[in-house]
Amino acid sequence: MLLGTFNITLDAKNRISLPAKLRAFFEGSIVINRGFENCLEVRKPQDFQKYFEQFNSFPSTQKDTRTLKRLIFANANFVDVDTAGRVLIPNNLINDAKLDKEIVLIGQFDHLEIWDKKLYEDYLANSESLETVAERMKDVK
């Protein structure tokens, strides 16, 4: 399970170093894809397969389904985690997420989000309260 917030940096070679607490979870290869609100999402390959299956259940006859799948999956990348826990972020994803040097990793239970620190701070500053969102979500199943 992935929990917590981690402040890290993007090095000159476009790599991030996973914090020690996350390295065991992401051994070998990972999948990085474009997420929502200008972040990237990181999953184990088997978890990415489950994520894909959720989208694959949507009717492909609907234009929004095709568009969403293209936007998320066309730029997804399998990436290796090296023995030092470093991950090379592909240039297209760096551009999609507007990543600069300061990065924030956000645990989302089953996946990790990669945010540019400034964009994440702006997102938090403009977000509604926990209570407001929870109240609105009470009937969602």
From Swiss-Prot:
Subcellular location: Cytoplasm, Nucleoid
Domain SpoVT-AbrB: start-end pairs: 5-47, 76-119
Matching InterPro entries: MraZ, MraZ_C, MraZ_dom, MraZ_sf, SpoVT-AbrB_dom, SpoVT-AbrB_sf
GO cellular component, one term: cytoplasm
Domain of life: Bacteria
MF GO annotations: DNA-binding transcription factor activity; transcription cis-regulatory region binding
HAMAP family the UniProt entry points to: MraZ (MF_01008)
Subunit structure: Homooctamer. Forms a ring.
Similarity annotation: Belongs to the MraZ family.
Annotated protein name in UniProt: Transcriptional regulator MraZ
